[in-house]
A protein has these predicted regions:
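Conserved catalytic cores of phosphodiester-cleaving nucleases, focusing on short active-site segments
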Residues: 63, 74-82
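Short acidic/polar mixed-charge low-complexity motifs
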Residues: 70-72
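Nucleic-acid endonuclease domains
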Residues: 1-59, 68, 80-216
């Protein structure tokens, strides 16, 4: 289920047909940052502005959306995509989605051992507590999709440790949000990260694998 406020935010962006930045050669992330700011700045001019808080640099997610109930908060990551796969791995975002931890409890940075410790000790199935993505199509900015991480159908697992879980937006956009249990989503995302790491180790040269074993 997608909360009404998030559907309303998505519809506002869809109807505005926001101008998306031209790609900057070798600097795709720069263009994406510009687009994220453009989307949030637009929302702050609408009647939804009182529900929108722009996150500071280095905070997880790009904005916080307050529910109409005046209490519930949704962490939203804004993506602009040409329909290709996009890196969507976020330790803090996933930790928030799968635990009872509040926004003010989230660590600034953490390693994987700390991530696993917290996600196991604070594990909680809370409806609509998720790490949300709003994806705007770079080729047609009226094509906007809203998904929670737990609702994604098209996760891709990679052996690249800096780019592990990706979303295939081209496939995702034509599908309805995935309905699955908390445990099923946990396996896809949290255990999916483990599978990515194992793939990375498996692809190492034998000499390096031996060094890894010695270190462990």
């Amino acid at each position: 289920m997608i909360p009404k406020i998030l559907n309303d935010v998505t519809e506002a962006v869809r109807n505005e047909k926001i101008k998306i930045s031209e790609g900057i050669e070798g600097e795709d992330r720069v263009a994406s940052l510009i687009d994220e700011g453009t989307v949030i700045d637009f929302l702050l001019t609408t009647n939804l502005s009182k529900y929108i808080t722009k996150n500071k640099a280095r905070e997880f997610g790009d904005m916080i959306v307050l529910d109409y109930d005046g209490k519930t908060q949704y962490v939203v990551n804004i993506k602009t995509s040409i329909g290709s796969s996009d890196n969507a791995t976020s330790k803090i975002g996933f930790l928030y989605a799968f635990t009872d931890m509040k926004l003010e409890e989230m660590p600034g940075r953490m390693n994987w051992p700390k991530f696993l410790e917290l996600i196991k000790s604070r594990k909680a199935d809370i409806p609509n507590k998720d790490y949300w993505f709003i994806c705007v199509d770079k080729n047609d900015s009226s094509n906007v999709t809203i998904r929670g991480a737990k609702q994604i159908n098209c996760w891709k697992e990679n052996a690249n440790p800096s780019n592990m879980l990706q979303i295939d937006w081209k496939k995702e956009k034509v599908l309805p949000p995935k309905i699955q249990t908390y445990d099923e989503a946990y396996d896809v995302i949290v255990n999916g990260i483990l599978r990515c790491i194992l793939k990375f180790v498996y692809n190492l040269p034998k000499e390096w694998k031996d060094k890894v074993r010695e270190t462990l």
